[in-house]
Swiss-Prot record:
Location of this chain's protein in the cell: Nucleus; Chromosome, Centromere
Comp. bias regions, Low complexity: 146-157, 201-214, 483-512
General function of this protein: Plays a central role in chromosome cohesion during cell division by preventing premature dissociation of cohesin complex from centromeres after prophase, when most of cohesin complex dissociates from chromosomes arms.
Encoding gene (name): SGO1
Name used for this protein in its record: Shugoshin
Organism domain of life: Eukaryota
The family this protein is said to belong to: Belongs to the shugoshin family.
Keyword hit for Cell division: yes
Source organism (scientific name): Candida glabrata (strain ATCC 2001 / BCRC 20586 / JCM 3761 / NBRC 0622 / NRRL Y-65 / CBS 138)
Length: 603
């Protein structure tokens, strides 16, 4: 027994080891499955929550739908009630007016002693009401028949079609049938009323009915309808055939025939639609396919060549219709022959006489002869463009007026900003003489000052003071170079007065008064030597920029002292720092023009 036990122990140990290892694997697999189960449970919970939310939303939508339907139905009922009441009011009003009209006719007959009508007004009104009731009954019958035919047609076609599309088609066919039936019934009722009214026995009711039935649908107004006003419409010729009284049975026969025809047409339409849907089994009929065919060219089933051919044909037709000969229209026969015989496409393109009129080159409707365009020698450069715009063909506007653009040369803006084509650097100089502002007195002002001085000389009281002070002839002494400026003798004054007598003769009396008054007032003043200032001073004119140099003189033209003591320049070109030497009044502005020079030389 001991040998068996000793021999069996290692096998048991191996089995135990295998069991331990498998147990670990089982534990790992268990953990994985538990985690997966927990995740799945969480996802199920979230899905349940979402489903509950969706159910709540669906229930809310259903409630809203029910409310909206109830509102729509109530609105429809209200609208129908309003319509019915309004129509009843209108009908009663029309009947009342008819009664009034008939009463007027009867009263006129009585006044004029004419034979009265065989039937009274009340009887006519009763007849109209009976006709109304019979027409309503006929309409109800037609509606019931049309509904029955529509239901039979819908049961046969609903098997192959979608529910919404079939219902819409049935409703449309029923509406058409009802509209036609109503129009027919109205026409027949109109003919009956015309037949019963007195004085209208000459008109044929059958012709009226046929004209109404066979009348075309009113077409849309176009521009060509203006020409129709040229032709006067002919009046309808009355036929001499006997009258045919339409009864209610004839009305019903006509309406039943129209209903049968419309039922056949609707059945044919349904069969055609069924056949179309048998070809397209899986594709649902929708409006998007038709929209895609027209709007998106990639989704279109037609090949591109067919589309291009169609567009070319349209363009050629439009070009053929355009009128080139403006002042000469061909006769009607030629137009009809040209319409019947279409010219080939090659003849239009190859014919040199045929001018293709584009949007840019329009035919000008004027009597003036067009001048031939001059071919300019210089060719304009093309505008820079990208690769996408190179394929587009259209005439670009000219950038310049026939001049080629050379981008190497400086632009006009650069020329305006700098004085020359050279670069501007720090070595450039500015001429200060160009910035001079010089105050030059005009000849008229100088003459006026001389005249005032001469008047002051004539007055006896002021002569002594003027001789003593010597302030009257300051400006005269500046102009005269040879005469000294410091001392004035009586002889020099007399000479100047005799020289300027010619100027003093033209002075007005007003100036004399002003000068006398000024001198009388100036006797009391302390500064008697500078009181000889005229009151009527001219306004200073605007300063002008002159090109002569600025002389830094203390005693320039505006100074009132007679003598120049210091001057800062010997010559105008010299620097002002070294102008410390006194110089004579020989440096004057030279005359600029030939005329002024000649005058100076003569003087």
């Amino acid at each position: 027994m001991s040998n068996l036990y000793s021999a069996g122990t290692p096998h048991i140990q191996e089995l135990q080891n295998i069991l331990d290892s498998q147990q670990e694997e089982w534990a790992a697999i268990k953990e994985n499955y538990t985690t997966q189960n927990s995740l799945i449970a969480k996802e199920n919970c979230t899905l349940k929550m979402k489903l509950s939310e969706l159910e709540n939303k669906v229930s809310q939508l259903i409630r809203e739908n029910v409310q909206l339907r109830s509102q729509v139905s109530l609105n429809k009922l209200e609208f129908q009630n309003k319509l019915a009441s309004q129509i009843n009011v209108l009908e009663n009003g029309v009947i009342q007016r008819l009664e009034e009209v008939l009463y007027m006719f009867d009263s006129i007959r009585k006044k004029e002693s004419l034979p009265s009508r065989p039937t009274s007004t009340n009887e006519t009104v009763d007849r109209i009401k009976k006709r109304r009731q019979s027409n309503e009954e006929a309409r109800n019958r037609r509606r019931s028949r049309s509904v029955s035919t529509g239901s039979a047609h819908s049961t046969s076609s609903m098997k192959r079609r979608s529910s919404t599309f079939g219902e819409d088609l049935i409703d449309a066919s029923i509406k058409r049938a009802l509209d036609n039936a109503q129009s027919n019934s109205l026409q027949t009722s109109d003919t009956l009323r015309l037949s019963e009214l007195p004085g209208l026995n000459e008109i044929d009711t059958n012709n009226v009915n046929n004209d109404n039935l066979l009348s075309p649908i009113p077409h849309k107004k176009r521009k060509s309808n203006r020409r129709k006003s040229i032709y006067v419409p002919e009046l309808p010729k009355p036929n001499n055939e006997p009258l045919m009284e339409n009864t209610i049975e004839q009305q019903e026969n006509i309406c039943s025939e129209s209903l049968i025809q419309e039922g056949e047409q609707s059945e044919k339409l349904g069969e055609n639609l069924d056949a179309d849907q048998s070809h397209v089994e899986d594709q649902s009929f929708s409006f998007t396919n038709s929209v895609l065919e027209y709007s998106i060219p990639e989704e279109n089933t037609l090949p591109k060549q067919d589309i291009l051919d169609e567009t070319e044909k349209r363009d050629t037709a439009v070009n053929q219709k355009k009128k080139l000969e403006i002042f000469h229209d061909p006769p009607v026969e030629e137009l009809s022959s040209s319409k019947n015989e279409k010219p080939p496409e090659n003849s239009i393109t190859n014919d040199p006489a045929f001018i293709t009129v584009t949007g840019n080159n329009k035919v000008k409707h004027s009597m003036k002869s067009r001048k031939p365009k001059k071919n300019k020698g210089s060719v304009d450069e093309s505008m820079p463009c990208t690769q996408s715009t190179e394929s587009v063909d259209f005439d670009r506007p000219r950038r310049t007026r026939g001049k080629t653009v050379d981008y190497r040369l400086p632009s006009l803006r650069a020329k305006m900003r700098r004085p020359t084509e050279k670069l501007v650097d720090a070595t450039t100089t500015v001429n200060i003489q160009d910035l001079q502002v010089k105050y030059k007195k005009s000849k008229k002002v100088l003459e006026k000052e001389l005249k005032t001085d001469m008047k002051a000389m004539k007055s006896p009281k002021k002569n002594e003071k003027t001789f003593e002070s010597g302030t009257i002839f300051k400006k005269i002494s500046r102009d005269n170079e040879s005469r000294p400026s410091s001392t004035h003798s009586t002889s020099s004054v007399d000479a100047e007065c005799s020289h300027n007598n010619s100027h003093s003769e033209n002075i007005n009396s007003s100036i004399n008064d002003t000068t006398h008054s000024s001198f009388n007032n100036s006797t009391k003043s302390v500064l008697s030597d500078i009181t000889n200032i005229s009151k009527n001073k001219q306004q200073q004119k605007t300063k002008k920029l002159l090109k002569t140099a600025i002389i830094n003189d203390i005693y320039d033209d505006k100074t009132k002292n007679a003598q120049k003591t210091v001057s800062f320049r010997v010559n105008e070109d010299d620097l002002s720092v070294f102008d410390l030497i006194q110089h004579n009044d020989t440096n004057k502005s030279s005359p600029k023009t030939y005329r002024s020079r000649s005058r100076k030389n003569k003087a």
